[in-house]
A protein has these predicted regions:
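Mature catalytic domains of secreted/periplasmic carbohydrate-active enzymes
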Residues: 19-403, 412-444
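N-terminal signal peptide c-region/cleavage motif recognized by signal peptidases
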Residues: 13-14
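Short, surface-exposed beta-strand/strand-loop-strand elements in extracellular ectodomains
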Residues: 369-381, 490-501, 548-553
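Sec-dependent signal peptide recognition
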Residues: 1-7
Length: 555
């Protein structure tokens, strides 16, 4: 890093810049949340009987005698993480099928009943030792769902008696994972968790980041594409934070709870290794596009790696991870100049004109997220020229623009709550004389018609209608349901509920008014799982007709 003649210019004139007084107390992170956000890039590892089945959900068809990953080497896994620049590994110790990769007496469906290392192997133990030896942080994914035991999303059993029995199993599994393998820095409950585990987390992992469930300290971004919408605010209301199923879409700059976002994403098309995935390895450009839209929007990117049936991460995948890490360093390892400061303007003079095309800005989030709008300007030909603008800065904002030669660079905060605290304001020349011809294309939302209503299928009195979402919601994400009238009055919608495996998923559907029109935001946390919508509706008049449409929310 070359810091050249950094000059902090604080312009306090209220006529020039607007610094609002916050009507609410700003949410602030715990030291552990702030440290977690500083990691920026972490690595997921998905490995389960699905790996032997060429499937993404364990169908329980693989004999345990067939699971023998003879070349499994957790040192290689850590090597891949280090080469990629990841600061933490999150290991899927038990996915939704229920197979356990550690020595546990809570189930017969696990590594103890495989031929690997004579049934004595313990992947969790090996990985913990490898990570702790190398200074790599470690997190664990423990699915509350358990297909082998017939347990649904979030740990839901079919009867009260079965629920009580499973609660004991899940609590014991969590206790083992958090007490036997050293410090766990992150705990994943995919699909939330209705099993009471708050006491266990408080006892064994009081400083860990918790993904989903009522004890959550971080939030799912709301897709599995590695894309954080912009702006993604770090705060949200305590009600949404405690729902257990919050997403980045719930962010609110004036919220009272700090809930930073995590973007889980795949390096191939799916989460588990499969022969069908062999041609789908993402390019470095695709991964960098993901990086810009996750880390560059203030989120943490959790990028998956998929060991094959030998237990090793394939060499092609390992190489791509290293190339990705190298490209991040090439672009952002050294700034041309940088500074820090407080107030409505931060400026630096590099001492001579320099060509730049990227700026990284970071707030001191320990004091809360204060910036609401900003402009970045360069002094070009003796005049200040706007290079880019935005709203949220938060932990990190990466801005890119056409290469331009500037004599000075300035950050102007045009709207804020309380005095802005800029931790870092840095300029880069990434492209040199060869800027890219086009940016990575954004993922487009596709709207589909789910259902038509009229007097032929909906009466004038309240009725219940069930709609199968399986073909419409194949990917995990937040889906938007809208009822669009084509004749007569609007359909009278009393309730919309999400059903999975016979269970109503509380808080997975949120009604919101958008431009005066009701929308229903549906949270699908597990891809490939059958879901239904249960509607309570009636016609306001016989001539009413229309359609229900659905699309996955991208922005």
């Amino acid at each position: 890093m070359n810091v050249l003649m950094a000059v902090i210019l604080l312009l306090a004139s209220p006529a020039a810049f607007c610094a609002e007084q916050s009507p609410v107390k700003l949410a602030k992170p715990t030291p552990e949340q702030a440290a977690w956000q500083d990691m920026e890039l972490t690595m997921f590892i998905h490995f389960a009987p699905s790996t032997w089945q060429d499937t993404q959900h364990d169908n329980l068809s693989t004999p345990l005698s067939s699971i023998n990953p003879e070349k499994l080497d957790t040192e290689q896994w850590v090597d891949v993480a280090v080469a990629m620049g990841a600061k933490q590994i999150v290991f899927v110790a038990k996915h939704v099928g229920g197979f356990c990769w550690w020595q546990t007496e809570t189930t017969d469906y696990g590594v103890k009943n495989t031929p690997w290392r004579g049934g004595k192997g313990d992947v969790m133990k090996d990985l913990a030792e490898s990570c702790h030896k190398r200074g790599m942080k470690l997190g664990v994914y423990l699915s509350p769902a358990d297909g082998k035991l017939g347990i649904g999303v979030g740990g839901r059993a079919k009867t009260p008696e079965a629920q009580e029995n499973y609660n004991r199993v899940h609590r014991q599994q969590l206790t083992e994972l958090l007490s036997l393998y050293g410090t766990m820095d992150e705990v994943w409950f995919d699909g939330s968790n209705i099993v009471p585990v708050g006491d266990i987390l408080a006892k064994y992992a009081p400083k860990a980041m918790i993904f989903q469930g009522p004890q959550a300290t971080i939030t799912w971004i709301g897709n599995e594409d590695g894309v954080a919408r912009y702006p993604t605010w770090n705060a949200m209301s305590s009600e949404k934070a405690r729902s257990g199923v919050s997403t980045g879409h719930d962010g609110d700059p004036d919220g009272d709870v700090w809930m930073p976002s995590e973007c889980d994403a795949r390096i191939r098309a799916d989460w588990f290794w499969s022969t069908k995935n062999l041609p789908t390895l993402k390019s470095v450009d695709q991964l960098m596009g993901m990086y810009y839209r996750s880390v560059g929007h203030g989120a943490v990117l959790l990028l998956n790696q998929t060991p094959d049936t030998t237990g090793r991460i394939p060499e092609e995948d390992a190489k791509r991870a290293a190339e990705f890490g190298s490209e991040i360093q090439r672009r952002f390892g050294n700034s041309i100049a940088e500074t820090m400061g407080k107030g409505n303007a931060v400026e630096f003079d590099p001492g001579k004109p320099v060509k730049i095309d990227h700026v990284i800005t970071q707030e001191n989030i320990l004091e809360g997220e204060r910036v609401r709008e900003y402009v970045i300007e360069g002094l070009v030909g003796g005049e200040w020229k706007q290079l880019c603008e935005g709203t949220a800065i938060g932990h990190k904002k990466i801005d890119q623009f056409a290469p331009v030669e500037v004599a000075k660079l300035r950050l102007r905060i045009t709207r804020s709550v309380a005095e802005p605290q800029i931790r870092r304001f840095a300029a880069y020349s990434v492209w040199g004389d060869n800027p890219p011809k086009a940016e990575t294309p954004e993922i487009a939302a596709v709207t589909r018609t789910l259902w038509h209503w009229s007097s032929e299928n909906v009466p004038l009195e309240m009725t219940t209608t069930n709609l199968d979402l399986t073909a419409f919601c194949k990917d995990a994400g937040v889906y938007v349901l809208e009822f669009i009238r084509t004749a007569g009055k609007d359909l009278d919608v009393q309730s919309v509920d999400l059903i999975s495996q016979g269970h109503k998923l509380d808080k997975f559907v949120v009604r919101r008014m958008v431009r005066g029109t009701p929308q229903y935001h549906i949270k699908i946390s597990e891809e490939g799982t059958a879901h239904q919508l249960q509607l309570s509706v009636k016609l306001p008049e016989a001539t009413s007709r229309g359609q229900a449409t659905i699309h996955r929310m991208i922005k």
